[in-house]
Curated annotation (Swiss-Prot):
The keyword tRNA-binding applies. GO terms for cellular component: cytoplasm. This is Peptidyl-tRNA hydrolase. GO terms for biological process: protein quality control for misfolded or incompletely synthesized proteins; rescue of stalled ribosome. Keywords: Cytoplasm, Hydrolase, RNA-binding, tRNA-binding. It is found in: Cytoplasm. The active site is at H17. Belongs to the PTH family. Hydrolyzes ribosome-free peptidyl-tRNAs (with 1 or more amino acids incorporated), which drop off the ribosome during protein synthesis, or as a result of ribosome stalling. Catalyzes the release of premature peptidyl moieties from peptidyl-tRNA molecules trapped in stalled 50S ribosomal subunits, and thus maintains levels of free tRNAs and 50S ribosomes.
Amino acid sequence: MILGLGNPGLEFSLTRHNVGFSLLDRIISKNGLFLKRKKKYEYSEMRMISGRVILVKPLTYMNLSGSLFPSIFSDFYMCIKNLLVVLDNVDLPLGKCRLKERGGASTHNGLKSISSILGSSNYSRLYIGVGSNVMRDIKSFVLSRFCKDEIDRLEKLYDFLSDELIDISEANFKNKVQKINSSNF
């Protein structure tokens, strides 16, 4: 399962906080998929030779992302180790990514919410760099929109990541980490 973090609503589209949603939108459109709606999230499914890939976009605000997991667990019978969370990172330069097998919630409230509900941080995450915070107020920065040049760079990154993430598995995870973490757009 790939969970893209973001805030629902048009007012948040193309903001730095919504790169998780933007990447999932690219994967969905590139593969001719459609979103289906549940009470707390939207999702799409792909059947692959290696199994199915479920793409999820929460309908909750970022800081409440963990609240959808009771529904997800009952709907899809998933295991935490098969979860990949895609989110923004203000400490990474724009266009740089970091794929990690597990880790702490750090200061990201979306991850804190997920880890709190799951009772574990034993899941993978893909951090997408959204640029350095030149503003003092982190909230204003992550809710700000990208400029055209930044969007162009991110479009290339989303194309690359959509190809790389579709066939990610336990068997090839280390190779994907190396390829994704060494990329720069």
